[in-house]
A protein has these predicted regions:
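A broadly conserved detector of short glycine/acidic/proline-rich loop/turn motifs that flank catalytic sites
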Residues: 10, 37, 63
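A short, structured beta-strand/loop element
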Residues: 14-54
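C-terminal structural segments of small proteins and small subunits
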Residues: 48-76
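Short, charged/polar N-terminal "headpieces" of proteins
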Residues: 1-17
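N-terminal start-of-chain detector that recognizes signal peptides
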Residues: 1-6, 27-31, 67
Length: 76
Protein backbone atom coordinates (compact mmCIF):
# COMPACT_ATOMS: atom_id res chain seq x y z
CA UNK A 1 0.00 0.00 0.00
CA UNK A 2 1.21 3.51 -0.81
CA UNK A 3 0.12 6.86 0.63
CA UNK A 4 -0.42 10.01 -1.46
CA UNK A 5 -0.30 13.41 0.25
CA UNK A 6 -3.61 15.29 0.04
CA UNK A 7 -3.04 18.26 2.30
CA UNK A 8 -2.30 19.51 5.76
CA UNK A 9 -3.58 22.00 8.29
CA UNK A 10 -2.55 25.39 6.87
CA UNK A 11 -2.34 26.86 10.38
CA UNK A 12 0.22 24.35 11.68
CA UNK A 13 3.94 24.90 12.03
CA UNK A 14 6.28 23.33 9.47
CA UNK A 15 6.87 19.63 10.14
CA UNK A 16 4.24 19.48 12.88
CA UNK A 17 1.02 19.37 10.93
CA UNK A 18 -2.07 17.23 10.98
CA UNK A 19 -2.03 15.75 7.49
CA UNK A 20 -4.32 13.70 5.27
CA UNK A 21 -3.21 11.05 2.78
CA UNK A 22 -5.08 8.81 0.31
CA UNK A 23 -4.07 5.19 -0.13
CA UNK A 24 -3.86 3.30 -3.39
CA UNK A 25 -5.92 0.34 -2.18
CA UNK A 26 -7.94 -1.19 -4.99
CA UNK A 27 -10.54 -3.02 -2.89
CA UNK A 28 -11.91 0.16 -1.26
CA UNK A 29 -11.12 3.87 -0.86
CA UNK A 30 -9.19 4.53 2.35
CA UNK A 31 -7.36 7.46 3.89
CA UNK A 32 -4.57 7.88 6.42
CA UNK A 33 -4.72 10.75 8.90
CA UNK A 34 -1.77 12.07 10.86
CA UNK A 35 -2.90 13.99 13.91
CA UNK A 36 -2.44 14.56 17.58
CA UNK A 37 -2.62 11.37 19.66
CA UNK A 38 -5.57 11.60 22.05
CA UNK A 39 -4.56 10.97 25.65
CA UNK A 40 -7.35 12.81 27.48
CA UNK A 41 -8.94 10.23 29.84
CA UNK A 42 -12.45 11.67 29.41
CA UNK A 43 -12.29 11.51 25.61
CA UNK A 44 -10.97 7.96 25.73
CA UNK A 45 -13.77 6.99 28.12
CA UNK A 46 -16.33 8.59 25.79
CA UNK A 47 -14.95 6.66 22.81
CA UNK A 48 -14.77 3.34 24.62
CA UNK A 49 -12.54 0.35 23.99
CA UNK A 50 -10.04 0.77 21.16
CA UNK A 51 -8.30 -2.33 19.78
CA UNK A 52 -4.52 -2.43 20.23
CA UNK A 53 -4.00 -2.16 16.47
CA UNK A 54 -5.98 1.13 16.28
CA UNK A 55 -5.41 4.64 17.64
CA UNK A 56 -7.58 7.66 18.37
CA UNK A 57 -6.26 10.88 16.86
CA UNK A 58 -7.51 14.45 16.72
CA UNK A 59 -7.36 16.54 13.56
CA UNK A 60 -8.57 20.11 13.00
CA UNK A 61 -11.83 20.79 11.20
CA UNK A 62 -9.87 22.71 8.53
CA UNK A 63 -8.25 19.45 7.38
CA UNK A 64 -11.69 17.84 6.94
CA UNK A 65 -12.97 20.94 5.12
CA UNK A 66 -9.93 20.86 2.82
CA UNK A 67 -10.62 17.21 2.01
CA UNK A 68 -14.34 17.85 1.39
CA UNK A 69 -13.61 20.81 -0.89
CA UNK A 70 -11.05 18.85 -2.92
CA UNK A 71 -13.39 15.84 -3.08
CA UNK A 72 -16.22 17.98 -4.46
CA UNK A 73 -13.85 19.56 -6.99
CA UNK A 74 -12.62 16.12 -8.03
CA UNK A 75 -8.99 17.06 -7.35
CA UNK A 76 -8.19 14.14 -5.05
Amino acid sequence: MRARFLGKDPESNEGNSPTLFATDRTDRATYIAQGWKVTDPQVLADVGDVPDHEAIIEIPEDVIKMWARRYQEGTL
